[in-house]
């Protein structure tokens, strides 16, 4: 039976502002990435998200981003590798404290937004992220864009496990990178198209680029976004379609 991880970015509410559909999404995913306060989230939200994740027995990971609350961590920043290292180490250490306090164990780290996209093509950024993970806890996995040489090389250098990730509702360029969110065609808004893309990636190992060319994708985890208007409906549908196709949903071991 084919096995795949379904992950989702959660814990992105901040103070009085609610973001996402965390409670409703949790039953349909196998791992979550918790915002750590830089691009979203706050200490109380981090604690509550960890506690809910443990109740649902899903794998918990840190979701560090750039210090950019107003831009939700989606804007590129001109930063050094040392700054990236500091940002990531600080954030994963903070989440790890909440996980340990709740009696759990953190499983992975997935960079957020612009940090993720920059790391996918910038070896220095990817190296800084992997180095922070290695120094924090080398048993933590790194979730990174499938086929990214920068992520692959950084994980190999520090001997940490790379979990290659694909996206359910994002379009791909010919080189295998994600279409920028500044482009009109960055998101797949049709639910059936997104589901077909996921099945194509999981069962056949490729995705159609925006140019119509096939791009090889060997994904071990699929990201579902939890903040869309129909996010819960989509997650439930993916979950049931996987069941019908005998695709097991399980966090990486």
From Swiss-Prot:
One of its GO terms (biological process) is carbohydrate metabolic process. The keyword ATP-binding applies. GO terms for molecular function: 5-oxoprolinase (ATP-hydrolyzing) activity; ATP binding. Pfam families: LamB_YcsF (PF03746). InterPro entries: Glyco_hydro/deAcase_b/a-brl (IPR011330), LamB/YcsF/PxpA-like (IPR005501). Signal peptide: none annotated. It catalyses: 5-oxo-L-proline + ATP + 2 H2O = L-glutamate + ADP + phosphate + H(+). SUPFAM superfamilies: Glycoside hydrolase/deacetylase. Keywords: ATP-binding, Hydrolase, Nucleotide-binding. Its EC number is 3.5.2.9. NCBIfam families: PRK05406.1-2, PRK05406.1-3, PRK05406.1-5. Forms a complex composed of PxpA, PxpB and PxpC. Belongs to the LamB/PxpA family. Catalyzes the cleavage of 5-oxoproline to form L-glutamate coupled to the hydrolysis of ATP to ADP and inorganic phosphate. This is 5-oxoprolinase subunit A. The lineage of its organism: Bacteria, Bacillati, Bacillota, Bacilli, Bacillales. The gene is pxpA.
């Amino acid at each position: 039976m084919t096995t795949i991880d379904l992950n989702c970015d959660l814990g992105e509410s901040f103070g009085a502002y609610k973001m996402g559909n965390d409670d409703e999404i949790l039953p349909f995913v196998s791992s979550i990435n918790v915002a750590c306060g830089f691009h979203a989230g706050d200490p109380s939200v981090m604690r509550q998200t960890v506690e809910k994740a443990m109740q649902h027995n899903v794998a918990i990971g840190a979701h560090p981003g750039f210090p950019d609350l107003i831009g939700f961590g989606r804007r590129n920043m001109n930063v050094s590798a040392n700054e990236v290292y500091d940002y990531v180490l600080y954030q994963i250490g903070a989440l790890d404290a909440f996980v340990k306090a709740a009696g759990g164990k953190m499983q992975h780290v997935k960079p957020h937004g612009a940090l993720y996209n920059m790391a996918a093509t910038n070896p220095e950024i990817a190296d800084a992220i992997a180095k922070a993970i290695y120094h924090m806890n080398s048993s933590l996995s790194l979730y990174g864009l499938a086929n990214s040489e920068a992520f692959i090389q950084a994980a190999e250098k520090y001997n940490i496990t790379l979990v290659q990730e694909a996206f359910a509702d994002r379009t791909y360029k010919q080189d295998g990178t994600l279409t920028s969110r500044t482009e009109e065609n960055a998101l797949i808004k049709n639910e059936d198209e997104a589901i077909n893309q996921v099945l194509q990636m999981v069962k056949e190992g490729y995705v159609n680029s925006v140019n119509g060319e096939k791009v090889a994708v060997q994904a071990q985890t699929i990201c579902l976004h939890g903040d869309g208007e129909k996010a819960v409906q989509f997650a439930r549908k993916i979950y049931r379609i996987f069941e019908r196709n005998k695709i097991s949903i399980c966090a990486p071991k």
